[in-house]
């Protein structure tokens, strides 16, 4: 559950309606893989991830980033039940993929950076604070199976 005021919810949803999921998702996942290179081990089947340029231009990274961001968008519609919304993804990432749950927090923070880059002054400190609450809630929900 994410506790947002009515104004925060409106602001989060308002900005999200402008997000180009394919573009932002690919960039967010790509930046995660570049900034935190140990995360690449989960994506070895994606081909060349040897350089920042290779990662950022990799079509499989872009496609998976889009998939991840679509899932994030689904969560925005269920802020009062994120654990239920992400229960199956939490199980997959914990039991089958063995992803360190810290990576969910890292990706959330990278997403906030990418949103700030794309939206500039429109991404105000108050909006950032609201998105930080959301990405923390999503990361917590995805890590739920680990507890």
Curated annotation (Swiss-Prot):
Keywords: Acetylation, Heme, Iron, Metal-binding, Oxygen transport, Phosphoprotein, S-nitrosylation, Transport. Red blood cells. Residues 3-147 form the Globin domain. CDD domains: Hb-beta-like. The modification S-nitrosocysteine is found at residue 94. The modification N-acetylvaline is found at residue 2. The modification N6-acetyllysine is found at residues 60, 83. Gene3D superfamilies: Globins (1.10.490.10). SUPFAM superfamilies: Globin-like. GO terms for biological process: hydrogen peroxide catabolic process. InterPro entries: Globin, Globin-like_sf, Globin/Proto, Hemoglobin_b, Hemoglobin_oxygen_transport. The keyword Iron applies. Heme b binds at residues 64, 93. Heterotetramer of two alpha chains and two beta chains. Involved in oxygen transport from the lung to the various peripheral tissues. Belongs to the globin family. This is Hemoglobin subunit beta. It comes from Lama guanicoe (Guanaco). The gene is HBB.
């Amino acid at each position: 559950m994410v506790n947002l005021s009515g104004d925060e919810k409106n602001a989060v949803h308002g900005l999200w309606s402008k997000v180009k999921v394919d573009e932002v998702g690919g960039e967010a996942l790509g930046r995660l893989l570049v900034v935190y290179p140990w995360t690449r081990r989960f994506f070895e089947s994606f081909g060349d991830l040897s350089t920042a340029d290779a990662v950022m231009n990799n079509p499989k990274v872009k496609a998976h980033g889009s998939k991840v961001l679509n899932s994030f968008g689904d969560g925005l519609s269920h802020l009062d039940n994120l654990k239920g919304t992400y229960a199956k993804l939490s199980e997959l990432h914990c039991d089958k993929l063995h992803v360190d749950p810290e990576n969910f927090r890292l990706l959330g923070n990278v997403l906030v950076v990418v949103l700030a880059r794309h939206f500039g002054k429109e991404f105000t400190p108050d909006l950032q604070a609201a998105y930080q609450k959301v990405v923390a809630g999503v990361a917590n929900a995805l890590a739920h199976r680990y507890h």
